[in-house]
Amino acid sequence: MSCCLSSRVHITRPVLEQFLSFAKYLDGLSHGVPLLKQLCDHILFINPAIWIHTPAKVQLSLYTYLSAEFIGTATIYTTICRIGTVIKDNAHLKILLLGY
């Protein structure tokens, strides 16, 4: 599906949970880092056209997960290409969403 065809109906909370579950699965594999990098780079982080059309609750779930759980995984530092920006953004999101 092209990103320009994305719609609110395509990305729901169950779809997000599948992405996050897949990210956790890949993180646990010894050979999963390249696929996790692709998932992060092309779906979870660098493609705002996907997430801008989703309901606010789905966006909140994604950013809460990113600021609370995802940033603590062992392979995160070697997986994400724009680590400085992501960590900085997650720190801001943590303050905004979680109050600390």
From Swiss-Prot:
This is Putative protein BCL8. Keywords: Chromosomal rearrangement. Pfam families: DUF4704. It is linked to A chromosomal aberration involving BCL8 has been observed in diffuse large cell lymphoma (DLCL). Translocation t(14;15)(q32;q11-q13). The BCL8/IgH translocation leaves the coding region of BCL8 intact, but may have pathogenic effects due to alterations in the expression level of BCL8. InterPro entries: NBEA/BDCP_DUF4704. The keyword Acetylation does not apply. Expressed in prostate and testis.
